[in-house]
Amino acid sequence: MTDKTEKVAVDPETVFKRPRECDSPSYQKRQRMALLARKQGAGDSLIAGSAMSKAKKLMTGHAIPPSQLDSQIDDFTGFSKDRMMQKPGSNAPVGGNVTSSFSGDDLECRETASSPKSQREINADIKRKLVKELRCVGQKYEKIFEMLEGVQGPTAVRKRFFESIIKEAARCMRRDFVKHLKKKLKRMI
């Protein structure tokens, strides 16, 4: 007999692995990390001092002192503390005093203009909400009809949208709602 077979006959536990034991490095690494997590305590995280957490702090502004944050904002806008316009790379003033006359409406208009949604995105969002409302049992249909009024685009797009919602309502066994949708579709055409 060979040495291996004698060893199996004498001590079978050395050959067969236990279900929780594994020799792979990833298993051992997970075990060590779990042990470290228990040692650190429940409130501490494993990435507390890592570069990732520092980057998150920089993004949120928690790691930047307020004095540096103010100077960074001033550098970004091009204004100094005395409201003189400056060149972005230098501290020399360019012109006289600059005043701003923005109202709340101007800011709202700029926000909507900076991130406009396309008709497809708006319609896809409405469709997702409509399907969610359709699947809720016992819902009133007024809310769904209000959402359907918000569909944007030409009549062909609206017609396709109504047809897809009719199919979804039929699939959800909403026969009375399908009748109402078909009436609205006929009025629209």
From Swiss-Prot:
Which subcellular locations apply to this protein? Nucleus
User: Is Nuclease one of the keywords UniProt gives this record?
Assistant: no
Identify the tissues in which this protein is expressed: Testis specific. Expressed in cancer cell lines.
Question: Which residues lie in Basic and acidic residues bias regions?
Answer: 1-23
Q: Which UniProt keywords apply?
A: Nucleus
Principal localization reads: nucleus
Pfam families in UniProt = INT_SG_DDX_CT_C
Residues covered by region (Disordered):
1-27, 83-118
InterPro entries xref list: INT_SG_DDX_CT_C, Integrator_subunit6
State any GO CC term: nucleus
Indicate the family of this protein: Belongs to the CT45 family.
Official protein name in the record: Cancer/testis antigen family 45 member A1
Top-down, what is the taxonomic lineage of the species of origin?
A: Eukaryota, Metazoa, Chordata, Craniata, Vertebrata
Gene designation: CT45A1
